[in-house]
């Protein structure tokens, strides 16, 4: 697991209050990790802050799984 992937997963654990073992790459924030719409907004904001990037709303809507978050940050982090 890359350092970037570890950082993304750590943010997910902190933001959603889930156990680290639940944060698998294929996990859906809503269906598997119990996030609601406010949780997902706060998660995107935490990712923006951690990786010093801005995630446009239309892109944020596509970040629905752990892997999607990792992929977005990998492609767009400063």
Swiss-Prot record:
Post-translational modification: 4'-phosphopantetheine is transferred from CoA to a specific serine of apo-ACP by AcpS. This modification is essential for activity because fatty acids are bound in thioester linkage to the sulfhydryl of the prosthetic group.
Domain of life: Bacteria
One Gene Ontology CC term in the entry: cytosol
Modified residues (O-(pantetheine 4'-phosphoryl)serine): 37
Keyword set, alphabetical order: Cytoplasm, Fatty acid biosynthesis, Fatty acid metabolism, Lipid biosynthesis, Lipid metabolism, Phosphopantetheine, Phosphoprotein
GO MF, any single term: acyl binding
Subcellular localization(s) per the UniProt record: Cytoplasm
Pathway entry: Lipid metabolism; fatty acid biosynthesis
GO biological process: lipid A biosynthetic process
Domain Carrier: 2-77
Any one Pfam family match given in the protein's UniProt record, by short name: PP-binding
Function of the protein: Carrier of the growing fatty acid chain in fatty acid biosynthesis.
Similarity comment text for this entry: Belongs to the acyl carrier protein (ACP) family.
Protein name: Acyl carrier protein
